[in-house]
UniProtKB/Swiss-Prot annotation:
GO cellular component: nucleoplasm
Name the record gives this protein: Homeobox protein Hox-B4
DNA-binding region, residue intervals: 150-209
Lineage, opening ranks: Eukaryota, Metazoa, Chordata, Craniata, Vertebrata
CDD domains hit by this protein: homeodomain
Amino acid sequence: MAMSSFLINSNYVDPKFPPCEEYSHSDYLPNHSPEYYSSQRRESTFQHEAMYQPRSACSEQLYPSCQSSGHQAAVLSPRGHVHPPAGLQSHLSEPNHPCEPGTPSPPPSCSQNSLNQSPSNSSCKEPVVYPWMKKVHVSTVNPNYSGGEPKRSRTAYTRQQVLELEKEFHYNRYLTRRRRVEIAHSLCLSERQIKIWFQNRRMKWKKDHKLPNTKIRSNPSSSSASLQIPPAASQSRSSGPASSL
């Protein structure tokens, strides 16, 4: 019914559309000239140059020896490629030698420091060996000594040492361990030397005063004979009560 009314009614105006050429994009988007794109490229190159500036500064700090004051600076293209000046092209054609960064030399080793020290410092650091710390009864040090019991030699006391020992013996014929250590330190002798000297001095003192030697034991047969009762005394005791009877 609707279609028939549409076809019958001839007063209906048919809509008309503009041609397709009028709907081109040029009406809505402006046409840009080639200068517009060239300006954009220039802006992008400026941004790249700003980004590469700190890296160029770092290269100047790391390799100061590779730069020369007489040469011109390299030109940076918009693409980021470096174009050297015309004067440097002949030099760049030759084989380039790697530039080594300037690094500080390493400090000398401890062995070199020890060798450079003066002999006076080394002598001061040597440990002090006192006479009482050395081995007793060894006259000379043999470098070819391979071991075994060293040969003992007689100790030669000085006059001052003998005088001090005689003074001590006059007051005390027997020394304590503490006093023996004190005398050994004061006279630069060992405890064994002090002990042997006092033993010999006591033997000499007993001999001068005719005292018996306490170290020599008496004969057991003589002591037992002295304890036995003589036979004459035993006979007199047995005959006494018989005569009274």
